[in-house]
Amino acid sequence: MASNSMSSSASWTRKENKLFERALATYDQDTPDRWHNVARAVGGKSAEEVRRHYELLIRDVNDIESGRYPHPNYRSNGNNH
């Protein structure tokens, strides 16, 4: 994920990403002030930072689905957990 600045949007913790995912499920695209609500749910990020993070996520998904990047090859170790 390329960025022109080294703001807090450049680095997201695993916890922040999980909070981000949950907030996206809670606040859909029709929610008024969606990005402010998502930012509040994540904590420590601005509405602009969460909006940008979402745009990068969508771009990554589109790139994967278009075949630009191969799907990861997860090997099974024999345990189906």
From Swiss-Prot:
The GO cellular component terms are: nucleus
Which SUPFAM superfamilies does the record cross-reference, listed alphabetically? Homeodomain-like
Q: Indicate yes or no for the key word Transcription.
A: yes
Organ and tissue specificity: Expressed just outside the vascular bundles in the rosette stem and the leaf traces. Not detected in floral primordia.
Q: Which GO terms describe its molecular function?
A: DNA-binding transcription factor activity
**Where does the record place it?**
Nucleus
Which parts of the sequence belong to the SANT domain?
Answer: 7-62
Source organism's superkingdom?
Eukaryota
Spell out the note in the miscellaneous section. Answer: Assigned as a member of the MYB-related gene family, I-box-binding-like subfamily.
Q: What is this protein called?
A: Protein RADIALIS-like 3
Species, as recorded: Arabidopsis thaliana
